[in-house]
């Protein structure tokens, strides 16, 4: 068992590489989880984040074995690669306080088939959802999203349908969807508010 006492921060790399850890419950007293704090905890399957958490450092839970993830509403800062290479995450819930998805935040997933970007998100970073092998449907909600980074959905080979609700097309890079939909007959389909508004996507 791990007891954190009255601490408000879990230091960088504190539990990195601890392959015996299977379950982690972060108490509400913790506000910040440092860089690579649980990086490489390959058997960590169950994570409960306390409502006090506001900041997750770079690669905080990278290379773990998580099966589900729910971000509390107080989380406002998500470090680069915070949950990268957690291929078994089957359910992903974004908190209401998150406005930006960092680079490589959730890269590599082999379980989720449908992803909805909530209306609170303004930017999607480079490589943030790259290598999602089962993703078939992407929904971008609301009117807040302004940009999608390079290779954000790279190699989502089964991505057949992208539903984009914003009336103004978010800025995309030439490779934001590189390799996406390549295994779909007829390739992927963009369902958008206006063909003219989204001309930059084609």
Where are these regions (language model features)?
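Generic detector of bulky aromatic hydrophobic side chains
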Residues: 37, 60, 82, 105, ...
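Structural signature of tandem-repeat unit edges
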Residues: 1-9, 19-32, 42-55, 64-77, ...
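Short, aromatic/basic amphipathic alpha-helical patches
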Residues: 174-181, 197-202
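Consensus positions within tandem repeat domains that build extended binding/scaffold surfaces
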Residues: 11-14, 34-39, 57-60, 79-82, ...
């Amino acid at each position: 068992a791990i007891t954190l006492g009255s601490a408000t921060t879990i230091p960088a790399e504190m539990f990195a590489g601890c392959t015996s850890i299977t379950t982690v419950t972060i108490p509400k007293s913790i506000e910040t989880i440092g860089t690579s704090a649980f990086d490489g905890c390959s058997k960590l399957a169950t994570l409960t984040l306390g409502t006090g958490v506001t900041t997750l450092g770079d690669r905080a839970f990278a290379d773990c074995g998580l099966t589900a993830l729910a971000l509390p509403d107080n989380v406002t800062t998500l470090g680069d690669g915070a949950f990268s290479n957690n291929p078994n995450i089957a359910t992903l819930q974004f908190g209401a306080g998150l406005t930006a998805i960092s680079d490589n935040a959730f890269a590599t997933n082999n379980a989720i088939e449908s992803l909805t970007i909530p209306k609170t998100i303004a930017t999607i970073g480079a490589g943030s959802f790259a290598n999602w092998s089962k993703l078939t449907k992407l929904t971008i909600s609301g009117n807040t999203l302004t940009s999608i980074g390079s290779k954000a959905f790279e190699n989502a080979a089964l991505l057949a349908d992208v539903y984009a609700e914003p009336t103004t097309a978010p800025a995309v890079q030439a490779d934001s969807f590189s390799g996406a939909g390549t295994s779909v007959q007829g390739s992927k389909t963009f369902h958008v508010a206006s063909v003219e508004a989204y001309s930059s996507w084609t």
